[in-house]
Amino acid sequence: MARTNESSPYVEFDRKQWRTLRKSTPLVLTEDELYGLRGLGEQIDLEEVAEVYLPLARLIHLQVAARQRLFAATATFLGEKHPDRQVPFVIGVAGSVAVGKSTTARVLQALLARWDHHPRVDLVTTDGFLYPTRELQRRGIMHRKGFPESYDRRKLLRFVTEVKSGAEEVAAPVYSHTSYDIIPGQYHLIRQPDILIIEGLNVLQTGPRLMVSDLFDFSIYVDARIEDIEAWYIQRFLALRNTSFADPNAHFHHYSGLSDRDATIAAKEIWNSINHPNLVENILPTRPRATLVLRKDADHTINRLRLRKL
């Protein structure tokens, strides 16, 4: 049985308990497909997909159906002509740099798109809503890139609002990790999806005004010990020397020739000055707002989950 406390808004599961909630949901991903979804350094395998992500996909599928019935009931009450109009179900995925939230979002997108009732599932990262480098420099916050103030939060809120309101086409800016900047004139076009997944560091933040998190129907926080996340970040940084950083046009190309020792020192400096403060000050405090917390162990495997019941 899952652990529950009548005074707590959460139900806690270990992986063995959670996997039973898959029921008869079929495994629809192949190893080759999973390879294409797996992020650098991630260890996710088909067993984890079956035991963690399939129950999650089933839960979200049930919630999508329930939410559509609720919207239809409200539309009928208001006397709208098309009470069966589908309203996009919006999912937020949050967590630290290097914790694996991008892989979580991609795997979830692939699984949810296999359901007949919601085949159109779009994924947008909040990187595209960072201010361009020139604007960050103008504001004197280039060193705060990734912190809440480095994002055009009004633009992100307007984007999600338009998608959820049923706009035929909404454009999301595209970010390049090679140039470390927004790509001028390039957009990811979102055309009335059944489900929209928004993935980013600070998507669960709250504030005195309407925030993008207020528009989420379901939210996930990918969690791990801070010491483990730091180790993963350093490992990823070292690996990037031979991949993204090796591109002569890459913003971080100057790191590609560093020795293991010097690259580790550089990664730790970035972690200590940017990623760790952002995690502790801004990202981690939003964890209690998540509908579901996925807790990873040091080997990247998800073995504990916490589901909000209220």
From Swiss-Prot:
Cited InterPro entries: P-loop_NTPase, PanK, PRK/URK
Compartment(s) of residence: Cytoplasm
Entry EC no(s): 2.7.1.33
Substrates-to-products reaction catalysed: (R)-pantothenate + ATP = (R)-4'-phosphopantothenate + ADP + H(+)
Pfam family, one: PRK
Broad class of the protein's primary localization: cytoplasm
Positions annotated to bind ATP: G95, S96, V97, A98, V99, G100, K101, S102
Family: Belongs to the prokaryotic pantothenate kinase family.
HAMAP family: Pantothen_kinase_1
Name the UniProt record assigns to this protein: Pantothenate kinase
